[in-house]
């Protein structure tokens, strides 16, 4: 039986203890993007949200938001556990570990933000505890969480696990992000919708990073295996946001939401280097203004003016990485 080729990304080397020299400029550039876009929960103003929560939303909308936030609050903890217990020790390249270090920090901030939103909106202690324990108490959340957690154990290859967590961050969040942006179109819940902009941008970057690492692997999965993982995630997300927690509660069309999830999945497959499964167009043209892809308008139209000044100069300026400039001249 032929031996498997060595994976440079996963092979222990003393170089991992020192940041320079950079071996993967694309990974380094992703790290600098993550560094440039750091934010904190204190930057999000929730003062208007309480008024909207009490006076502008109906019971169905409140139910939807509560359960979406409950899923988000739990899922970030699962992503964190995978990063801390698996990916940080799997990957042996210092610039990739640097990215994961920032991802761990920002996932903690996402978790804090979602918990703060629930704490702000839900006054009843018993209901709030029920939502914070959604993995145990809410079946539709538990199903998504169980799918994500099964990829943390040691039985699958790194390639399979990185595809699965690209699905968690690229597909499992897509319907919920889209629904919250729908509320933004209506001018409701500015704190929730602003934090959603920040978090969806971050998750897009994390998904892009997973795709980049996958493309750098020497041994990739069969197209059939990748599509099996992606389509499984699509069905679970579709069930969650179309049936178990129907997007109709916030006035969105079920069939169009299902199509949107398929569109997101096809885009992910393309980023991984595979063909489309669904071949559908984006039914929500207004989502193109937001886009879950981390690269989209990242520096031109950053939301909330929170990109840290000068951080990208080492990549975009006259430094060591001139050949890897992130151009602002292209049309995204």
UniProtKB/Swiss-Prot annotation:
Key word Metal-binding present: yes
Tissue specificity note: Expressed in roots, cauline and rosette leaves, stems and flowers.
Active-site residues, Swiss-Prot/TrEMBL: 114
Class of enzymatic activity (EC top level): oxidoreductase
Effect of residue 97 to C: In tso2-3; white sectors in green organs, uneven thickness, rough surfaces, and irregular margins of leaves or floral organs
Main location: cytoplasm
EC number: 1.17.4.1
Origin: domain of life: Eukaryota
Transmembrane segments: none
Knockout mutant characteristics: Embryo lethality when homozygous.
Cofactor: Fe cation
Pfam families reported for this sequence: Ribonuc_red_sm
GO CC terms of this entry: cytoplasm; nucleus
Binding site for Fe cation 2: 107, 169, 203, 206
Residues annotated to bind Fe cation 1: 76, 107, 110
Assigned keywords, A-Z: Cytoplasm, Deoxyribonucleotide synthesis, Iron, Metal-binding, Nucleus, Oxidoreductase
Record text on cofactor binding: Binds 2 iron ions per subunit.
Known catalytic reactions: a 2'-deoxyribonucleoside 5'-diphosphate + [thioredoxin]-disulfide + H2O = a ribonucleoside 5'-diphosphate + [thioredoxin]-dithiol
PANTHER family listed in its UniProt record: RIBONUCLEOSIDE-DIPHOSPHATE REDUCTASE SMALL CHAIN, RIBONUCLEOSIDE-DIPHOSPHATE REDUCTASE SUBUNIT M2
Comment field (misc): 'TSO' means 'ugly' in Chinese.
Function: Provides the precursors necessary for DNA synthesis. Catalyzes the biosynthesis of deoxyribonucleotides from the corresponding ribonucleotides. Involved in DNA damage repair and programmed cell death inhibition.
Family, per entry: Belongs to the ribonucleoside diphosphate reductase small chain family.
Subunit comment: Homodimer and heterodimer with RNR2A. Heterotetramer of two R1 and two R2 chains. Interacts with CSN7 (via C-terminal tail).
Protein name per the record: Ribonucleoside-diphosphate reductase small chain C
The species this protein was found in: Arabidopsis thaliana (Mouse-ear cress)
Taxonomic classification: Eukaryota, Viridiplantae, Streptophyta, Embryophyta, Tracheophyta
Annotated gene: TSO2
